[in-house]
């Protein structure tokens, strides 16, 4: 029984750390447009609420997921209220920009990385505002 609890604990820790964003070394190329990642997709699906907001639901539990998620090679952030964020957001003392509308290679709500935002601010390879 004790081994089973330890095993479940390790499985939980591994699943939680796999969902945290990890970023590659920053390079000096800066463009405008899409940002993609090679991180594995989070195990869930998008649900559109009546108020027009999006939530990401876990396929395992059926509950909303919170924090950083990856969907179709894009980073998103789900707030504590279960809704996808858009626009400029302060997360853990850093400022990020999430697409306010779908544009070429940049879906609604996806994190801008190593680019200029539509309002012409630069974000680094981690998506953090550089200016």
Predicted segment positions?
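Extracellular adhesion/carbohydrate-binding repeat motifs centered on closely spaced tryptophans
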Residues: 4-131
């Amino acid at each position: 029984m004790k081994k089973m609890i330890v095993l479940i604990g390790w499985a939980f820790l591994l699943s939680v750390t796999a969902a945290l964003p990890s970023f590659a070394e920053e390079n000096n190329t800066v463009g405008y447009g899409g940002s993609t990642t090679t991180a594995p997709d989070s195990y869930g699906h998008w649900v559109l609420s009546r108020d027009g907001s999006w939530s990401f639901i876990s396929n395992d539990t059926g509950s909303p997921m919170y924090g950083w998620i990856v969907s179709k090679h894009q980073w998103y952030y789900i707030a504590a209220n279960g809704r996808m964020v858009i626009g400029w957001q302060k997360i853990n003392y850093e400022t990020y920009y999430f697409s306010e509308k779908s544009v070429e290679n940049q879906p609604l709500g996806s994190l801008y990385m190593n680019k200029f935002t539509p309002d012409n601010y630069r974000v680094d390879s981690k998506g953090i505002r550089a200016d």
